[in-house]
Curated annotation (Swiss-Prot):
Misc: Heme 1 (or BL or b562) is low-potential and absorbs at about 562 nm, and heme 2 (or BH or b566) is high-potential and absorbs at about 566 nm.
Family: Belongs to the cytochrome b family.
This protein's encoding gene: cob
The name this protein goes by in its record: Cytochrome b
Main location (coarse class): mitochondrion
Source organism phylogeny: Eukaryota, Fungi, Dikarya, Ascomycota, Taphrinomycotina
Organism for this UniProt entry: Schizosaccharomyces pombe (strain 972 / ATCC 24843)
Length: 387
């Protein structure tokens, strides 16, 4: 134990992972941070191995992925773990964000931690999209064409930005080279931001379900929460092994098994399942520029939460209005994901528009209103007690 505190590097790890004081009442909802760190390390290691065999060329990219699966030793496992690892990463990311929303982790003094987390979320979406485009299959080719065209919504220079990103007049070899380089780089940027996220968290410590400062009742990270984290990590490893061995392509569209054909459009162009809610918001607004703005705002609105929540109490544990509207918001998010994966027919367009309106209403109307109402009820109760 002496070397853990005398060695500067081990002392740093000791302060963050062993002797770190944590609230004694945090539940398994606080395990998603360690799960995300575990998945990120796995994704980086497997991604480096896959990059050794991938060829960023429109004619050879699809064949190189097929060669990885068929000819490279355990290549089929590498691809299955990497593809399904992305899905697990987003599952844990959404649960992590949802826990932060419910328990008010964005409120002072953890605002900086929250803001860094939102930036990580945005970069993760970009990284996932870049990786989705790399196999150059039918769905990823047309997905890349559609999503990169969103840059044309930028006034005056939009078309030039699209051509700059493409490296030509369509998705081609320069595009894949750019996407491959950025997809290789971004996980390391995310890892660096994750360290910043951890440093910011360590400054004030973790929150807890009660939403109160727990400096008087803390226990060390090791062995209590370290063992608890290992339990969920083992459960995750069981889950990803099941997906990799028994259902490796369960999250993929059938068109992902076809090579890219620039002359034939798929029946329905959809992104991966974890981006469907934002795709639904994009499609719900008829105006192209407003749709792009709404899609970006649906992510960046998370940065505004510390300014929109006026509650004197952190979190929704003791807020019945907050509980009701939070779970309604979760249902709305699931509906948006369903609409994003459906064909843009009249009934789905209408449902998507209603779900989009509620999505933004939750942040800009409902949260300010019910937090102010909650404060008013607390003040009235306190004033009646004083009398």
């Amino acid at each position: 134990m002496k070397i853990l505190k005398s060695n500067p590097f081990l002392a740093l790890a000791n302060n963050y992972m062993i002797d770190a004081p944590e609230p004694s009442n945090i539940s398994y909802f606080w395990n998603f941070g360690s799960l995300l760190a575990c998945v990120l390390v796995i994704q980086i290691v497997i991604g480096i191995l896959l990059a050794c065999f991938y060829i960023p060329n429109m004619d050879l990219a699809f064949l190189s992925v097929e060669r990885i699966v068929r000819d490279v030793n355990y290549g089929f496992l590498l691809r299955a773990f990497h593809a399904n690892g992305a899905s697990f990463f987003f599952i844990f990311l959404y649960l992590h964000i949802g826990r932060g929303l419910y328990y008010g982790s964005y409120k002072y003094p953890r605002t900086m931690t929250w803001n860094i987390g939102v930036i990580i979320f945005l970069l993760t979406i970009i990284t996932a999209f870049l990786g989705y485009c790399l196999p150059a299959n039918q769905m990823s080719f047309w997905g890349a064409t559609v999503i990169t065209n969103l840059l044309s919504a930028v006034p005056f220079i939009g078309d030039d930005l699209v051509h700059l990103l493409w490296g030509g007049f369509s998705v081609s070899n320069p595009t894949l080279n750019r996407f491959f380089s950025l997809h290789y780089l971004m996980p390391f940027v995310i890892a660096a931001l994750s360290v910043m996220h951890l440093i910011a968290l360590h400054t004030n410590g973790s929150s807890n379900p009660l939403g109160v400062t727990a400096n008087m009742d803390r226990i060390p990270m090791n062995p209590y929460y370290l063992i608890k984290d290992l339990i969920t990590i083992f459960i995750f490893l069981i889950g990803i092994n099941y997906m990799a061995f028994y259902n490796p392509y369960g999250f993929m569209e059938p068109d992902c098994a076809l090579p890219a054909d620039p002359l034939k459009t798929p029946m329905s162009i959809v992104p991966e399942w974890y981006l469907l809610p934002f795709y639904a918001i994009l499609r719900a607004i008829p105006n192209f520029q407003l749709g792009v703005i709404a899609m970006l705002l649906s992510i960046l609105v998370l940065l505004l939460l510390p300014l929109l929540d006026f509650s004197a109490i952190r979190g929704n544990s003791f807020n019945p209005f907050g509980k009701f509207f939070f779970w309604t918001f979760v249902a709305d998010f699931v509906i948006l994901a369903w609409i994003g994966g459906s064909h843009p027919e009249n009934v789905f367009i209408t449902i998507g528009a209603i779900a989009t309106i509620f999505y933004f209403s939750y942040f800009f109307i409902l949260i300010p209103v019910y937090t102010i109402l909650g404060n008013t009820l607390i003040d009235l109760n306190l004033s009646s007690i004083k009398r």
